[in-house]
Amino acid sequence: DTWVDKTLPLGDLRKRVEGSGWLYFECDGHDYSSIKETLAHAKTESQRPVFIYAHTKKGSGVSFMERFDSNGKFYKFHSGSPSDQDYMSAVNELVKKLGFSHELNWSQSIAFKNGIDVESDDLTPKTRNQSLIQIWAGILEELFESDKSLIALDADLSYDTGTYKVADKFSAQYIQCGIAEQDMVSMAGTLALSGKIPFVHSFASFLTTRAAEQIFNNLSENSKVIYCGFLAGVLPSAPGHSHQAVSDFGIVSSFPNIEIFEPACETEMSLMKSLVYESDKSIYLRVGSVDLPEKVDPKMVQLGRITQRKFGEKYAIITSGPSMAKIALEVARAESENEIAVFTYPTPKRHFN
């Protein structure tokens, strides 16, 4: 999302590499001649391992993709897919540089044999109409405003996990850990034992697998940490299978001394404001990135209880999270009006325990 020196400064990279016994080379990663020449030099070394540092610029070759945002802090084209318009502008700029005179113009479309319609989704967490990430950013801001013992830790995903407001307004309570979930979780455990309440932020697929051992160690020491796992579940699928968290619930459920909280909407998410203080356990906040079902009356939402979303007299569907809540409501409304009831339960592990 941002500059390397703001996430995990490299220091004197040459000294670090050569100090480990490696041969160090640098080259221009956008210059094929420079790359070819460097590789030729590297091949002459037969005794030591070789480290090549290729200097590159993200979005190089496309004028508007080489720039950061207006405040120079975040890179726009890291989080979310480019819009069709931006994509075509980038393609045509590259085509022109290659010496072609004609412009390309097409729209993205995918056709399935079963007739399912698929639309491209270029919305980011900050531009989606209603997003749990936006809501979480506001909740964090509210909590941090009144409590200096709270610390936000971020794995270079401030836009995708909602820590951007805390980073701007409460920088003394914000730690940018870079893409290093194991270190981040261990750091959080130490902060918790010193009397702080740390909020750890990353994608669910990375947080619960890479740092599973560190999470378990923290729990075994009764240190209270709020683990915030985003992009949970199969949808949205655009980031690919590596970013889809389908085992996180099972992994965290096997741990002791931890609550699981999976809100389905803004109203349920607001319960985190009280759960952070009421629970004496660590909390795993499981957040999906799909559009949300409609809000419910705050009077219908209470910690440790199911939330009724639709009345029904014959059957009941009980689920958690926004994705399944939307599907359950669609299924229930496809039947007779009062036949199927729909409930969401944001604290499912309490039931299993």
Provide a role label for each language-model segment.
Residues E26, F100-R286, D291-L292, M300-L303, ...:
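Thiamine diphosphate
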Residues D1-S101, I258-N353:
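Glycine-rich ThDP/TPP pyrophosphate-binding loop and its adjacent helix/strand module
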